Amino acid sequence: MTQAICSACGKPAKALDWTCRSCHASLNLQALPPFDASAINRGDFSLWRYRAMLPVARRFSLGGGMTPLVPVEIAGGRFLAKLEHLNPTGSFKDRGTAVMLNHLADNGATDVIDNSSGNAGASLAAYAGAAGLSATVYVPAATAVESKKQLIRAFGGAIIESHDYLADVYAAAESATYASHAWNPYFVLGQQTAAWETWEQLGGRAPDAVATPVGHGGLFLGFYQGFKALREAGLIETIPRMIAVQSAGVDPVVRGWAAGSKRPPKVKPAPSLADGILVDAPVRGEQILSALHDSDGLALRVENEAILASQKAMHRAGHIIEATSAVPAAALPRIRELIGDEAELVIALTGSGLKSLAAR
């Protein structure tokens, strides 16, 4: 039976826990069902086609997942884009939220909370509405985008703006269920479905490399763990080289990788266009660095100027993505230099730019 356990001390957690009650470390899932290709429900064109590999009782769905995988060419090179910004609320967060909230609702949660700069909050509010739960989102008063706050409210979520929103949400978690996109292991489990879809869309094989923006690293780890499950099932030989790309404004993973550390250092945030990955201390930082080592991966940083140029190039290529989503493509010239022009590269386009365009 699948069980959440502490990543540090190994103690089991309760169903609604978001962190270890003993040592306050993050939680991992153990005894997950092995990946079974014969169990895929090929008539379900959502992430729930992998229901046999997702040990939660499905109660509701907004149809997230099964996003297109399409070729893109911009200055700097070619790649395959996984269009995660086409999920129901406009970001990859819907994968993790769908699995996490089905788990929490099945275990008695009624009031859920999270802290978010926008996308995770919109996703939580939408899926909570579908589940009949109430959702409250703590947003940073100084940086939250107005259009994203409007989206959270449109989905029925309540908003609390705070200058210390992390401290406030941790305090609120004493009485409400903390449905955290950073801490909850079921959120990361939901992200594995992106890897499984990519494998299917490529005809039952893995690409040579996968690049994502990295803040807390939920999608990055989901891709890594998803491909790891495929390797353990004997369906691929090698996990793709995982490429973590961060803004030069907040780049703890890049610094930890460059230093050969097991844990990213805490950094002082600097201004960045990539507001969705302004994370100075990733909850699963050690796991991200471990995944980089295991996959012979790369960790790269990009400047604001490159992010803006990449976003504009992607817009002209037909993909309206937000600045955070443009971070990996901003590193494309360097990625191609390191992995070669012929390597098959998948880049996740993580969030829609329509939300930010509406705010201009």
Name each region found by the language model:
Residues 1-360:
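PLP-dependent amino-acid enzyme catalytic core
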